[in-house]
Amino acid sequence: MKTVATDIQGGDAARQALESCISKGGVALFPSDGIYGLACDPLNEKAIARIHEIKGRDDGKPSAVMYLSPLAMRDLIRDLGQRVSEAFARLLPGPVTLIVPNPRHRYPLACREDPSRLGVRVIAGPLAGVRYPLFQTSANLSAEPASSSFAGIVPEVRGAVDLAIDGGRLTGLPSTVVDLTELDENGVWTVLREGGMSRGDLVAALGR
């Protein structure tokens, strides 16, 4: 396992290491904005299966796809309606997972049972600029709490990855999950999980 910190060379070493790991089909441990996560290529079935094995998790549970570069999500944006596109512009990057319509059934391994819906994350920070989208989930054993510090990640998880990126201590808040699948058609949005983005910020961006 290779370990690299985000504070080395302004994050360049961490970004390059993450791109290399993902492109080779590896699994990476990385700092999100609130908690540590596990990541791999969202089209690599073997790598995704490894993540589920590391976590001891049911592989039928959906996961979000994370983007660290606007260019990486340009094809996805073309499929979005006007109101969802506006929501992206107002809320991302940020501590929020947006569930959006997925008419082309992109990333079916992340969507699992319902490929018509896709969870999307975009975060800022030292890893911003990584060219590849990431299949991502929290870096913890299933049903155990996620960690906001590199040192707090259990050895069973940290020792099972190909790359570990130390980003120091994070906020400890998971992303707020918001369903936008009915926003364009009915003007409706729903919070599925409270987290790092407040309801007030959501109302300001999306309306009531």
Please name every model-derived segment.
Residues 1-208:
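Active-site-adjacent structural elements in enzyme catalytic cores
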